[in-house]
C-alpha cells in the first residue's frame, strides 16, 4: 500500500485546474472516480443491492462536496451527472441534490468513506489514489477554494500515521500552496 499525501494531491489538482476548462476538469474528475468504483464493484459482485449501496455512497460524497460551501456550482453538478450516467444511475435533479444535502450528516459521510476505504488494501494503489484525487478535483471545481468542511471529509480517506494529511485545518492552510 502506497502512502498518500494530501498536500501533493491538492497541489496536483490545483495545477490541473489551471490548465483545463471546466468541462475538461469535470471529465477528469469523473474519469478518476470510475477506476476505483469499477474495481470495488468487481470485489462486491454484481448484486444490485451492493451496487446501489456503492453508488449511493459515492453520491453522498459528490453531494456533500457540491453543497458544503453553500454555493451551487454547475461544474461540480456536471461532474456528478457524468459519473452517475457512467455508473448507469439517473442523477438527482438540482432540487433533489439540495434535499439530500439537508439530510446528510457528518456521521453518514464518515461511514460512507469508511466503507470505501475498507477496500483500500484490495484495490490497486493507483486507483485508490485516483479516487481521492477525484474528490480533491471536485472540491476545487468551479471555485478557487477548498473549504474546511471538504478538508475534514477528504482527510477521512487517509490512514493516520501512514499517509500524510495535516492534523487540522489551520495546519493544512499553512502547508498548502
Residue ranges and their predicted role:
Residues 1-67, 71-177:
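Small-residue-enriched hydrophobic alpha-helices in membranes
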Amino acid at each position: 500500500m502506497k502512502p498518500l499525501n494530501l498536500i501533493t494531491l491538492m497541489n496536483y489538482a490545483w495545477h490541473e485546474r489551471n490548465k483545463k476548462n471546466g468541462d475538461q476538469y469535470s471529465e477528469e474528475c469523473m474519469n478518476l472516480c470510475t477506476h476505483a468504483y469499477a474495481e470495488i464493484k468487481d470485489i462486491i459482485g454484481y448484486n444490485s443491492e451492493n451496487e446501489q449501496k456503492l453508488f449511493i455512497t459515492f453520491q453522498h460524497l459528490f453531494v456533500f462536496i457540491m453543497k458544503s460551501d453553500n454555493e451551487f456550482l454547475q461544474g461540480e453538478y456536471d461532474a456528478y451527472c457524468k459519473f452517475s450516467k457512467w455508473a448507469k444511475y439517473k442523477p438527482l435533479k438540482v432540487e433533489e441534490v439540495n434535499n439530500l444535502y439537508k439530510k446528510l450528516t457528518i456521521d453518514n459521510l464518515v461511514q460512507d468513506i469508511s466503507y470505501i476505504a475498507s477496500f483500500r488494501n484490495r484495490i490497486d494503489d493507483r486507483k485508490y489514489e485516483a479516487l481521492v484525487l477525484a474528490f480533491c478535483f471536485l472540491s476545487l471545481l468551479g471555485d478557487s477554494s477548498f473549504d474546511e468542511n471538504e478538508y475534514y471529509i477528504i482527510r477521512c480517506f487517509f490512514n493516520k500515521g501512514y499517509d500524510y494529511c495535516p492534523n487540522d485545518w489551520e495546519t493544512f492552510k499553512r502547508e498548502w500552496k
